[in-house]
Amino acid sequence: MKRKVSLKIRKAHRYLGIFLGIQFLFWTISGFYFSWTNLDEIHGDHYKNLEYEPLSFENLISPSLIKIKESINSLEIRDINKKPYYFINKKWLYSARSGVRKNELTKNEALYIADKYMKKGLEVKSIEKITEVGKHHEYRKKLLPAYVISYKSDDNLKAYVSISDAKFQSVRHRSWRWFDFLWMTHTMDYEGRDNFNTITLRAFSLLGLITVLSGFTLAFVTTPKLMRFFKKN
């Protein structure tokens, strides 16, 4: 009877181990990578101009003079080619000197914005406008449309500037992409990569716990000394 129980537990433990083994391997590899990488480098700080200081502007008109239908709830100042603009209600750009609305950011203006935030000496390879991205894209969940600026680099370096708010958004490079891929395998969010509460992750975590417990149980039922010890106590 004990032998049958032992064989059943051993069989269950083996199949659970095979089923979960690949995911356990991904968890181990990704955890190892995360613990050995510098997050500042993953964020691309070594490609950024960390000494950048925004320009200060004078002789700006009062925002109340700008003719918009909505009341002003939020306001930020943007520097576009050394000219001040108001970004109002997280929707519109208006000149902070003339009050004229700016409808579109040009490629040259996007390059100017990126140049302020990126390290000096980088050579631009290309710039293109993107209007949509997939769930796994490196610019997912950020403001669109945007300009993606590619630099001549062995690291496949790219910078993103959103058009509607004239804002520098992010830097992407090869190490970040590896981190992003391993993060997906770690969280098991194969839909969008950013959800840490997926049903798949919960299920595999539970199965992993069952696998460990089955291993302890197997060790217990196959070790006579342990069984005798617990019977005595």
Model region roles, listed by residue range:
Residues 1-233:
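Conserved histidines in hydrophobic membrane contexts and catalytic metal-binding motifs
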